[in-house]
């Protein structure tokens, strides 16, 4: 094992550990709260489910990383690759849609518009979110089912490639695989568009609210303004981290067709782990209960608060 492989394994292991800790923290805090009160808000439910999916996603990515390093032939074999791709695709798409649903929920609860359509959605926010979550599940199943044709084409052109008979038929099949693989990325467009729309509405709502505050001569740092800013930070961070994740996903997916196949796959795998860990940490900072518990935990660790003291999770 060379220096590059060693650095790859260290980075993968570090990001995996941090991601697991962050998402398990969310599970522990929200799970403890639900256990005590037997109630869970819609936003907490989405965040908790999202954290669980990201734990699974991180495990899939780590497994993929170790197979790339220690058993590349097994990784590229038909059945193993298909199991990883199916698990990754379903978990990945569902987690992205849940993050999108969270952005829509924040938008409907915080933004203020007088348009009849927006008011209709705002008054029925719980029902809207239930339908969005069901739609997210169906779309995630659809994106996973779309892999069937991709698997068939991949099997055909890999079989031709193994014979080292690079014919026009081989080039045609490879082009078809490229096309289907690229078209498969279009499943990412709907959640991105919805997230961008939620972000835009919150920006417009914040601008109008700020102008009203200035006209009334009141402070612009009121709870409504802070809620707008917090939601905007969460949605914007998801948007940019997802773009980075999408780039990494493309690098990892098309690694077989790049000059330095193994290096491309390793870079892609390391980059993909940053999103499920980074965005979950931002969710902690944007959620008052999670943030307070996190601060209390840090104070306990640093010795500024006695372990017996009651923080948000114990109260």
UniProtKB/Swiss-Prot annotation:
Cytoplasmic side: 27-41, 115-127, 207-233, 287-315
GO biological process, one term: detection of chemical stimulus involved in sensory perception of bitter taste
Domain of life according to the entry: Eukaryota
Record key words, sorted: G-protein coupled receptor, Glycoprotein, Membrane, Receptor, Sensory transduction, Taste, Transducer, Transmembrane, Transmembrane helix
UniProt name for this protein: Taste receptor type 2 member 3
CDD domains according to UniProt: 7tm_TAS2R3
GO molecular function: bitter taste receptor activity; G protein-coupled receptor activity
Transmembrane segments: 6-26, 42-62, 94-114, 128-148, 186-206, 234-254, 266-286
Gene coding for it: TAS2R3
Other observations noted: Several bitter taste receptors are expressed in a single taste receptor cell.
Function: Gustducin-coupled receptor implicated in the perception of bitter compounds in the oral cavity and the gastrointestinal tract. Signals through PLCB2 and the calcium-regulated cation channel TRPM5.
Membrane topology according to the record: Multi-pass membrane protein
Alphabetical list of Pfam families matching this protein: TAS2R
The organism of origin for this protein: Gorilla gorilla gorilla (Western lowland gorilla)
Residues carrying a glycan: 165
Upper classification of the organism: Eukaryota, Metazoa, Chordata, Craniata, Vertebrata
Subcellular location: Membrane
Similarity field: Belongs to the G-protein coupled receptor T2R family.
Topology, Extracellular side: 1-5, 63-93, 149-185, 255-265
Assigned GO CC terms: membrane; plasma membrane
């Amino acid at each position: 094992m060379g220096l590059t492989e060693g650095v790859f394994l260290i980075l993968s292991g570090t990001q995996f550990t941090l991601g697991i800790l962050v998402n398990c923290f969310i599970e522990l805090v929200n799970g403890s709260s639900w256990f005590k009160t037997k109630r869970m808000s819609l936003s907490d439910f989405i965040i908790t489910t999202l954290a669980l999916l990201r734990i699974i996603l991180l495990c899939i990515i780590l497994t993929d990383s170790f197979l790339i390093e220690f058993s590349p032939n097994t990784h590229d074999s038909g059945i193993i690759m298909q199991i990883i791709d199916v698990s990754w695709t379903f978990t990945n798409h569902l987690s992205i849609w849940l993050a999108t649903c969270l952005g829509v929920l924040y938008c409907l609860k915080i933004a203020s518009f007088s348009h009849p359509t927006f008011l209709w959605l705002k008054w029925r926010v719980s029902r809207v979110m239930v339908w969005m979550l069901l739609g997210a599940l169906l779309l995630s199943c659809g994106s996973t089912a779309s892999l069937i044709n991709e698997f068939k084409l991949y099997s055909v052109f890999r079989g031709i490639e193994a014979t080292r008979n690079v014919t026009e038929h081989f080039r045609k099949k490879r082009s078809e695989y490229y096309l289907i693989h690229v078209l498969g990325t279009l499943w990412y467009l709907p959640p991105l568009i919805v997230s961008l729309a939620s972000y835009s509405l919150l920006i417009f709502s914040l601008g109008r609210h700020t102008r009203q505050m200035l006209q009334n001569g009141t402070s612009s740092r009121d709870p409504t303004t802070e809620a707008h800013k917090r939601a905007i930070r969460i949605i914007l961070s998801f948007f940019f981290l997802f773009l980075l994740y999408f780039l990494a996903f493309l690098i990892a997916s098309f690694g077989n067709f790049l000059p330095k196949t193994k290096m491309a796959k390793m870079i892609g795998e390391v980059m993909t782990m940053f999103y499920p860990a980074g965005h979950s940490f931002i969710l902690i900072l944007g959620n008052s209960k999670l943030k307070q518990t996190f601060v209390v935990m840090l104070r306990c660790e640093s010795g500024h608060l006695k372990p017996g003291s009651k923080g948000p999770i114990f109260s």
